[in-house]
Amino acid sequence: MKFSIIALALAVAFVCVAESRSEEEGYDVSEEIQAEELEEAARGGINRKLMEMVNKLRKVQGREDSEDAGRAGINRKLMEMVNKLRKVQGREDTEEAGRGGINRKLMEMVNKLRKVQGREDSEEAGRGGINRKLMEMVNKLRKVQGREDTEEARSLKDKVKSMGEKLKQYIQTWKAKFG
């Protein structure tokens, strides 16, 4: 968890520095970022994106005002996840969609969450049911992802390391220019 927070902080800092640099030098960083996103999606970005969503849902789950989060935040996040999964499942050329494994399990979990979400006793579901279902989903995702996590973690670690080095270089050039 600490590693992902550090990685996120580095990514945000990298983008901020790159954008300020691009404004000064008149070059567009959005193309570079878009290329990185496409590359990330090609390397199994689906699983990583789902884990990011799960981590965001954990933050919502941990809040003390779980009643409000249960009614508004979690439901909105779940609908975003459903829409993303529909887009992924609609692609016939995706390997995972072809095999059906990960996407089928996720759609089963989403359908279970929809049943909980649709109940009229939303207060009860918001406090306990959805949180329990989310933790079950986290555990299932961990089992599915555990097979390829080592390889992805290494590539992510290398990517974060290179981003950190780039960030250091940008900071040094910025300090050299502006003192």
UniProtKB/Swiss-Prot annotation:
A motif (Inverted processing quadruplet motif 4) lies at residues 147-150. Residues 23-43, 63-71, 91-99, 119-127, 147-154 form a propeptide. A motif (Inverted processing quadruplet motif 1) lies at residues 63-66. A motif (Processing quadruplet motif 1) lies at residues 40-43. A motif (Processing quadruplet motif 4) lies at residues 124-127. GO terms for biological process: defense response to bacterium; defense response to fungus; killing of cells of another organism. Belongs to the cationic peptide 03 (latarcin) family. 04 subfamily. M-zodatoxin-Lt4a: Probably forms an alpha-helix which disrupts target cell membranes. M-zodatoxin-Lt4b: Has antimicrobial activity against Gram-positive bacteria (A.globiformis VKM Ac-1112 (MIC=0.3 uM), and B.subtilis VKM B-501 (MIC=1.1 uM)), Gram-negative bacteria (E.coli DH5-alpha (MIC=4.4 uM), E.coli MH1 (MIC=4.4 uM), and P.aeruginosa PAO1 (MIC=>35 uM)), and yeasts (P.pastoris GS115 (MIC=>35 uM), and S.cerevisiae Y190 (MIC=35 uM)). Does not have hemolytic activity against rabbit erythrocytes. Causes paralysis, but is not lethal when injected into insect (M.domestica) larvae. This is M-zodatoxin-Lt4b. It comes from Lachesana tarabaevi.
